[in-house]
């Protein structure tokens, strides 16, 4: 029951889509209706409104960090350890991917995963962000940057965290994140994948 008390609020927090909220605030089309149909920062950027994309990025990343921070504060009070923090992290990530408020059709989890990594260990999060940024700047594909960063994440989780529950969650998140990019992988292979900053024509 104590774990559920951490997981459920984390899942509900993860279910908040900042891409949809930002689009409503800036009076933009729903991001689920154009581009990739994904309510994440990269697709919101295709609206041409950079401020909305930044809001989405900070919101989606912030909820991942917040879930971890709250769990780290609450776990000792509930006489729980890192397994509780790991459970909350997985809860907020699954909430983003399968949000109850959007009929379980959410984003791909890149920003939320980054927020979680920053919460687990700031250096680990910064390393992930640096890898993403380097790949994105070199090839201009957000999806490729996410896939590369996700593929490497379990290795630097082992380095910074060792063998423990949070490392297992990083591994699970990496698999889910890559799986959520399966259509992007097909696009990269076919040469039809959209580059960062390309505005939607739909």
Swiss-Prot record:
Enzyme class (EC, first level): transferase
One matching Pfam family: G3P_acyltransf
EC code: 2.3.1.275
Compartments, record wording: Cell inner membrane
Disulphides: none
Gene Ontology BP terms: phospholipid biosynthetic process
Alphabetic keyword roster: Cell inner membrane, Cell membrane, Lipid biosynthesis, Lipid metabolism, Membrane, Phospholipid biosynthesis, Phospholipid metabolism, Transferase, Transmembrane, Transmembrane helix
Domain of life of the native organism: Bacteria
Reactions listed under catalytic activity: an acyl phosphate + sn-glycerol 3-phosphate = a 1-acyl-sn-glycero-3-phosphate + phosphate
GO terms for MF: acyl-phosphate glycerol-3-phosphate acyltransferase activity
GO cellular component annotations of the record: plasma membrane
Parts of the chain that traverse the membrane: 1-21, 84-104, 116-136, 143-163
Membrane topology type: Multi-pass membrane protein
Function: Catalyzes the transfer of an acyl group from acyl-phosphate (acyl-PO(4)) to glycerol-3-phosphate (G3P) to form lysophosphatidic acid (LPA). This enzyme utilizes acyl-phosphate as fatty acyl donor, but not acyl-CoA or acyl-ACP.
PANTHER family, sorted: GLYCEROL-3-PHOSPHATE ACYLTRANSFERASE-RELATED, INNER MEMBRANE PROTEIN YGIH
Family recorded in the similarity comment: Belongs to the PlsY family.
Oligomeric and partner information: Probably interacts with PlsX.
Protein name per UniProt: Glycerol-3-phosphate acyltransferase
């Amino acid at each position: 029951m104590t774990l559920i008390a951490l997981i459920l609020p984390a899942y509900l927090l993860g279910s908040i889509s900042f891409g949809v909220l930002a689009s409503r605030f800036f009076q933009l089309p729903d991001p689920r209706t154009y581009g990739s149909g994904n309510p994440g920062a990269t697709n919101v950027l295709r609206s041409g409104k950079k401020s909305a994309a930044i809001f989405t990025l900070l919101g989606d990343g912030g909820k991942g960090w917040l879930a971890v921070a709250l769990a780290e504060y609450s776990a000792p009070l509930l006489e729980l350890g890192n397994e509780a923090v790991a459970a909350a992290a997985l809860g907020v990530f699954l909430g983003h991917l399968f949000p109850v408020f959007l009929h379980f059709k959410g984003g791909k989890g890149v920003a939320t995963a980054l927020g979680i990594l920053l919460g687990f260990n700031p250096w680990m999060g910064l390393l992930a962000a640096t890898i993403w940024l380097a790949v994105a700047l070199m090839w201009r594909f957000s999806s490729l940057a996410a896939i590369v960063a996700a593929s490497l994440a379990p290795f630097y989780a082992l380095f910074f965290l060792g063998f423990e529950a949070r490392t297992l969650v990083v591994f699970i998140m990496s698999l889910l994140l890559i799986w959520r990019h399966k259509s992007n992988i097909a696009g990269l292979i076919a040469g039809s994948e959209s580059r960062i900053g390309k505005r939607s024509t739909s």
